Amino acid sequence: MRVKEQLLTLRAYVPGKNIEEVKREYGLSKIVKLASNENPFGCSARVTEALTSLASQYALYPDGHAFELRTQVAKHLGVKVEQLLFGSGLDEVIQMISRALLHEGTNVVMANPTFSQYHHHAVIEGAEVREVSLKDGIHDLDAMLQQVDDQTKIVWICNPNNPTGTYVEKQKLLSFLEAVPKSALVIMDEAYYEYAGAEDYPQTLPLLEKYENLMVLRTFSKAYGLAAFRIGYAVGNTELIGQLEVARLPFNTSTVAQSVALAALEDQAFLQECVKKNEEGLHQYYAFCKEYNVFYYPSQTNFIFLKLGIPGNEAFERLMKKGYIVRSGAAFGIDDGIRITVGLKEENDEIIELLKELVNEQVQKEETYS
């Protein structure tokens, strides 16, 4: 028995190491996980309240249409309920879109590096993947446009981008949307939207009416702190969303996920407090990078990508032995960098002290051999 040939070329997704795994491996009692861009402040207290009322529903199938959540998300965003497609996290939404649109003979255009699942699902569906290197850490939309042809079904734009935290500014996106063929679906993956505060960061939802080939993805996993519950959604053209519903599994979002997402959505004050604290945390890293002359990408997310002057895998291992889990840039094809999730203030302070040690050791080593 053999699976599709294209599956043999892929590897299963490898998430960052979990806390218990690292404790066992290194004999540590305290672990700080700053690898998966989770919200260090948790989730709204309203989520806990919502969970206590669900016990009587455990034996029942969920609302397959997610009516209440759909209604409130549409109201929050100012869109029609028919424009929303819900999934078990954005991973499933990406899978649904890829399954519905891609096949052998088609192609997708994306940046490199960017979120890995765009590439993964394109390969599974037999589509050609056309990757364009980032320019100064940012999507090179001009170069990406050159890769688009009549067989391009999807153009993926991760904005802000994972793993660099950078963003495509409004005017460049508008120029791209005007130039790209209407036959290509331009998907803006805005998983980190709530953290993006730059003045020229594009607000894409108002653009949906003009550009029918535009789609926006958002999630409750990041700023809302609901990663464990797996719920995200797409916003797009009503006709296309209706067609994509056919590819959605029945009851794909659980009663629990729908309920906690609704509770989290209602507590915008908690969300804004998380965003504020995250911005303060980013500035802790910026101050370190500037003082120690460490390269970094200014971030519009809850993580920062930086280069310490040593291989990312080495930095990853050395930090992990101290009880701090980060993500090596090697996982994204940037061998000399690491990605660090912004944590609590004290967590940021602690890991920054370790980063200083790594930088100082490297400087001393270079001076010895110079």
UniProtKB/Swiss-Prot annotation:
Which residues does the record list as N6-(pyridoxal phosphate)lysine (modified residue)?
K222
- Molecular function, one GO term: histidinol-phosphate transaminase activity
PROSITE patterns the UniProt entry points to: AA_TRANSFER_CLASS_2 (PS00599)
Stored Pfam families: Aminotran_1_2
Identify the stretch annotated as signal peptide in this record: none
Against InterPro entries, the record matches this protein to: Aminotrans_II_pyridoxalP_BS, Aminotransferase_I/II_large, HisP_aminotrans, HistidinolP_aminotransfase, PyrdxlP-dep_Trfase, PyrdxlP-dep_Trfase_major, PyrdxlP-dep_Trfase_small
Q: Which UniProt keywords apply?
A: Amino-acid biosynthesis, Aminotransferase, Histidine biosynthesis, Pyridoxal phosphate, Transferase
Q: Which regions form coiled coils?
A: none
EC code(s) of this entry: 2.6.1.9
Enzymatic reactions: L-histidinol phosphate + 2-oxoglutarate = 3-(imidazol-4-yl)-2-oxopropyl phosphate + L-glutamate
Entry's Gene3D superfamilies?
A: Aspartate Aminotransferase, domain 1 (3.90.1150.10), Type I PLP-dependent aspartate aminotransferase-like (Major domain) (3.40.640.10)
- Look up keyword Transferase and say if it applies: yes
What is one Gene Ontology biological process annotated in the Swiss-Prot or TrEMBL record?
L-histidine biosynthetic process
Can the keyword Membrane be found in this entry's annotation?
Answer: no
Q: In which pathway does it act?
A: Amino-acid biosynthesis; L-histidine biosynthesis; L-histidine from 5-phospho-alpha-D-ribose 1-diphosphate: step 7/9
Q: How does it assemble?
A: Homodimer.
Family listed: Belongs to the class-II pyridoxal-phosphate-dependent aminotransferase family. Histidinol-phosphate aminotransferase subfamily.
Q: What name goes with this protein?
A: Histidinol-phosphate aminotransferase 1
Organism, scientific name:
Bacillus cereus (strain ZK / E33L)
